[in-house]
Amino acid sequence: MFTTVQPTNRSSLPDDLFTAIKELKRELNAVILAHYYQNSDIQDIADYIGDSLGLSQQAARTPADVIVFAGVHFMAETAKILNPDKLVLLPDLDAGCSLADSCHPEDFARFKAQYPDHIVISYINCSAEIKAMSDIICTSSNAVKIVNQIPAHQPIIFAPDRNLGRYVSQQTGRDLVLWQGSCIVHETFSERKIIELKVAHPEAKIIAHPECEASVLRHADYIGSTTALLNYSLKSSEKTFIVATEPGIIHQMQKSAPEKLFIPAPALNNCACNECPYMRLNTLEKLYLCMRDKTPEITISEDLRVKALLPIQRMLEMS
């Protein structure tokens, strides 16, 4: 669960937020973890930038006393599950996740009860309550690897992302029972507009996140997690890429390979719908305020934390 108190006293912000945040980080012995989908200025001040797997691994081993999570609430909650004695802060408590919200604990409990012989592998983009009902957690980086380690005779429920589940099923040859959840960002990409971009840039490689719909993935030259997409684009000899995931990742791509062209995949409508509205709620100002005021703090009951911890630990062991 989350506190409901937002940072107060937003006046008198320092002129140099970067310097002020660095000073607070030293005072608090804090680490700033940021997802690739965060605004570029937050990425630039973070101690570690990564995908869900990398951020979980960093959270599990950080010596810092305070974890400032520039991401969405299930990520900060995961950090708290792994670090019950540390102060975990989230700049904006409204930074939720459409995918996590698509899987309500009561509904999932009824769904799970229909398949008593199945184990549950849940994508990390879910609440602590869903994690507690799971046997193993996975990320887009390791989902295929984890499913491949499950004995062939063992049936599997995969939740909550149907698109990632479908992709994992295709890659592993396993029949998975899928929860029908999805990410609003990765389902907004337009197949037609991506094809039009490819026609305009025939030399471009299409790279896509497996949360995208099958209609988009079938055009992709490479499919992978955000970290995998970044690494592929940097190692490839190609110079132009159409990027079908949240465009925040392009900041790191451009920093690492300024000579290359990265084109964000367009949405169905003429809007900024390919940007995650929840990730973008975090700002440099809110990052400073949450560190200054030490709130909003992420809290979770010990009983729920212990239940949610085990499947996360299994993931880290199997990765």
UniProtKB/Swiss-Prot annotation:
Q: Pfam families from the xrefs?
A: NadA
- Annotated catalysed reactions: iminosuccinate + dihydroxyacetone phosphate = quinolinate + phosphate + 2 H2O + H(+)
Molecular function terms from GO: 4 iron, 4 sulfur cluster binding; metal ion binding; quinolinate synthetase A activity
Cofactor notes: Binds 1 [4Fe-4S] cluster per subunit.
Q: Which UniProt keywords apply?
A: 4Fe-4S, Cytoplasm, Iron, Iron-sulfur, Metal-binding, Pyridine nucleotide biosynthesis, Transferase
**Record's GO cellular component terms:** cytosol
Q: Which cofactor does it need?
A: [4Fe-4S] cluster
| Listed EC numbers | 2.5.1.72
For this chain, the family text in UniProt reads: Belongs to the quinolinate synthase family. Type 2 subfamily.
What is the name listed in the Swiss-Prot or TrEMBL entry for this protein? Quinolinate synthase
**Native source species:** Microcystis aeruginosa (strain NIES-843 / IAM M-2473)
Gene designation per UniProt: nadA
